[in-house]
């Protein structure tokens, strides 16, 4: 069958554009068959699946085949498998755990490209399980000398920390060491990881400030790393104020001299964050930002405006000097530039320039479209309402601005404009008369009814109707207002607006009746009455004929609303109809109820606090977690009770008549009616409720109505604020205010000093309604931390590492079994010492294992028996136990035998780091490693890793390092070859794998370094490396009788030497500890007086070492015996270099 390649697949997809999905599904079926073939077919199939996945198709069904291709030994196949895994694997992929071993294996591959693939793939598919299993391996890679692998390993650490936060504490010391690495790219990777970590918890990384400051001052051309360091300092400076003072000079130099705009921007951001109180530096930053804003590049202009916005929050006056530059940005073609310029306007606004700024925005509003138009409307209202209208000196001007904004079609800010109209009229009493007249004109505007969608600009009619009705005492032409309220086209408006129209038409009629009868209107203040009296000189008085005409208009036009499809509109229309009928009847009887009618709408209103709902205290005894109506005790509503629907509606209708009518702008009438309707259905099925519940619900309803500022009637709620609005200081205006008219007057600026009209004194009422028991502390906003619940941000790096701060290490089950056996043997041995006359307590217990593990245990025991010598014979005691306890006896003997055999300690790879050359030309550091032996013949292998750095300004050629020691001392098994060319200021590594033939004569290794500078004579240096003899000492536990046998045999320890350590106040336990730790020499027997002990060890070439140590008056003497005096001299030298410390 013909098999498609990737090229064929792509060509086929392009040729089947009309039925692309069908063609791809056909290819997937073919690929499923190819995945059953050999590895080459699987590789091609996985490659095609990767491309199909990029087109959006799911290939999770092939995850196992992808893992198979990843495990292929062929690099080309492995690369395709890793790419497919990076593209398709996620946290929900089950087979991802099968790739753990393969990734770990590729980390240590001799082919660096395979290590690259594994690291790149891990960064994409890292899960919690993978991070936990591979964290230790990544940490091991940080010790590699291969720079490219090291950089990738450091970068992958960040993904490890995100998925497995517990690895941060044990891994952070090694990450911190890489900040001192001589390779700049390694330092850059470390800075990147630390910068990302510091965004979560900056305090953890304050101790790194000195190292980072040194990198900042010493780095010149690595702009990417400098950007990261500067961003890191921006996170640290808020937590350490002294750091900001230290950064002033280097940041000033970078801002003045750096050609990198990105670095300049980050430096300015850091200055804003941590050095905002340094005025010269802030002026420098603002001047640099001005050059960015004036640049032709749109990206630079955007960054300049963004940074200027951050400075404006701290130094608004300094930014306001550049108002003209920001206003010019409003004319930019890029909408993102214009939006950023809008964000800067609040910091540049004052009483003097608010008129110019608003009219500038209105000019742009004429040509604006879409989202930008909405942003301009929102920004105009934001500028004018800042600080409770602190910049507004002419509220009539602001009312006209709002009216002009309400005439913009297809805007979504109808509710915002409506709320502003309500807020201004409620707070500023002197503007109420003017606003009322303007709202009547607004109600007649047919444009607002052309798009009667809920939430649109028709929402302004809600506020207009409410203002006209609430302050209808200022209405001198009630007929105009009622005709606007009851015009037929009102029926197309949303229901909540219609209901407000109904209620406020009654308010207008009530005030007209009161005026016609000469009654005092309680809602008007004294100042308002004087103004009203002056304006009535030119206006017609309201007569009884006008009232009768108003009554006829309402009755004639109310019929359409009493038959409305909206329940709330119909209810209020019927209510008004009944009230007017009652008014007509009482009037015919000669009674005047105008005072009673006007008394329904005389309650004083105050704005509601913006956080009033949040500050409502929880009543004592109220449990918010307890069910109000337990669902378990609710009776289900039966569907066959259809005859109750009329009772339900009647109940709802009666309940609505008992409600006080709303006048506020909340738009919740529909929701209230639906809620009442749903609750009435429930009440009909549970009609006989307890009187206590009825009383509680009544009190709850009255409390809500008392706290509603727009609820008319009822008792006046208790106010917390005792401030008298009349005692608020009067704002002195700069000039007279001219008369404004809708349509033309909104285009004029704020009044100037040349105006001739009498001054008006505006008083802004800042009183707000708050619930009882509210506290001032409740006014604080809760600042949400993005990483508040992040596990990585909660880790404290300042605490010292503990025993629990270790990385997870996966072990085979046989290793776990061996460890348990050793623990049991040690426990048995300890118990035998404590009670030698009784058998160990562990003899009565045996571990129950699964059949799969039992063979492994047998193999382990056989291996242990073959590698360890038999235990020394011990005296056996006679046992008188019955035969039934033979199994127990056998277990006891085997346990005691295991206790006698000391398992060899695990092989520890020792490491020493030395500087072997540091002159004007080269610096060479050497890492000496004791290689873990694969067999007995490899027990003396040493690996040397030399890092060679060219310190000169010229290139070196023919660089080589060669061993000079004779073959009878050591032999070079493998090396990295000639170094070759070493560029100026560059570094490289040279490795040597040596086999030490004679451990006694190879304490000093000799090498020759040759190099040829480009413009100087050849260089020859002799290198000398001292090998620690502790590399060749094997820790051996030896019984006392064997130790005595070695001392008695002639020739095994014939040479003897002595040394003494004085003046350190040493103790025998400390000497025993240091000899075991630093020289691997184990104690054989310690005298009970604690002043004498014997020690034993042997070399890797089976030289016996016996030692007797005596302590007297804080001085320690060492008597050493070995086969050769040269060995004694080496040991004396090693003992002299021991570091004795009690820590």
Swiss-Prot record:
Main localization category: membrane
Record's keyword annotation contains RNA-binding: no
All residue ranges annotated as the GAE domain in the record: 914-1016
A GO term from the CC aspect: AP-3 adaptor complex
One Pfam family this sequence matches: Adaptin_N
Ranges for region Disordered: 520-541, 634-692, 704-728, 741-792, 829-899
Keyword list, A-Z: Coiled coil, Endosome, Membrane, Protein transport, Repeat, Transport
Coiled coil (UniProt feature): 526-550, 814-835
Biased composition (Acidic residues): 524-540, 666-675
Compartments it resides in: Endosome membrane
HEAT repeat copies, ranges: 129-166, 167-203, 205-242, 245-279, 280-317, 318-354, 356-389, 416-455
Biased composition (Low complexity): 854-867, 881-899
One of the GO biological process terms: Golgi to vacuole transport
Residues annotated as signal peptide: none
Domain of life: Eukaryota
Quaternary context: Adaptor protein complex 3 (AP-3) is a heterotetramer composed of two large adaptins (delta-type subunit and beta-type subunit), a medium adaptin (mu-type subunit) and a small adaptin (sigma-type subunit).
Family that this chain belongs to: Belongs to the adaptor complexes large subunit family.
Biological role: Part of the AP-3 complex, an adaptor-related complex which is essential for the compartmentalization of the endocytic pathway.
Protein name: AP-3 complex subunit delta
Organism encoding this protein: Dictyostelium discoideum
Native organism taxonomy: Eukaryota, Amoebozoa, Evosea, Eumycetozoa, Dictyostelia
